[in-house]
Amino acid sequence: MENISPALLEWFYKNRRSLPFREDPTPYHVWLSEVMLQQTRVSAVLPYYYRFLEALPDIPALAACEEEKLHKLWEGLGYYSRVRNLQKAAKLVCAQYGGQLPADYAALLALPGIGEYTAGAIASISFGLPVPAVDGNVLRVFSRLYNDPGVITEPAVKKAFTARVMEHQPPEKAGDYNQALMELGALVCVPNGAPLCGQCPLAEVCRARAAGTTAQLPQKAKPKPRKIVPVTLALVESPAGFLVQQRPQKGLLAGLWQPVLWEDEHLLQAEVLARLAALGLDTGTAAPAALPAAKHIFTHIEWLMSGVQLHVAAQSAPAGYVWANREQLRTTYTLPGAFRAYKPLLL
């Protein structure tokens, strides 16, 4: 196949979106944007990107940020391990590299939370290094370009596609080339069997288009079935606010805050009241109201939530819990998106 970079770059320079991390592609800006864009659309990321940089304009500021503030800045983006790894890496960068990301692919790859794609994006876009940056968009483009039925989630297939990506990369324009492939996958060679081939600068050399197989590519492994987990919540409100607790520092939703809940259990109202009493909470004669059922899907787990809402008299919080008023829940305590259905009641 002839080299695709001339046609690809010509298209990119005419059609690329104007994005803040492209207009000012410092290593920190590119790093932050790539981490935020994992699992999240550009349109959803931009308000968070601006807000995060306003609060934490450089790597030393990120490294020094308090955990609650960091979580609050990320609230709504989900996948909070991303921001925890951002801070871990920032602390290492301050300790080892004077607060500046190293212009070295291997050194970037050694930082917490930075995988091959993110390291490649920073190294090529910010430092101009001729390295690959292969994400799902790029894999989809090359799967169709070469009409390759390989399962793109398999390491050997990804390695082969990465080699093909590098065959076409102009070393002096590595960053633009990598961004052009990502942009093509995001705007034209889109997923779910609906590529806009009439707008593609590579249509004439695309083997899947010639074979009529674009709708079948790329091939992905069958997803594993999610584990269904029943969850019972109790939104307990007193004059001091709602009763909340911090989740453990490891595991699902680590370090975030939640209402009173019991995982792996679907409890009746009487059982909820008994559990609250066992915590040492005086529920008095309060008549609980049923919460609407809701669900939240994590990568491999699906929560099926139900529960109650009740008001109680002023009293001390049970051990391990705090009372948080609405203002504190808005500004201080980070409630994850898993409780989105109930946030109107809490905020």
Could you say what each language-model-derived stretch is?
Residues 1-18, 23, 186-347:
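Intrinsically disordered, low-complexity, charged terminal extensions of DNA damage-control enzymes
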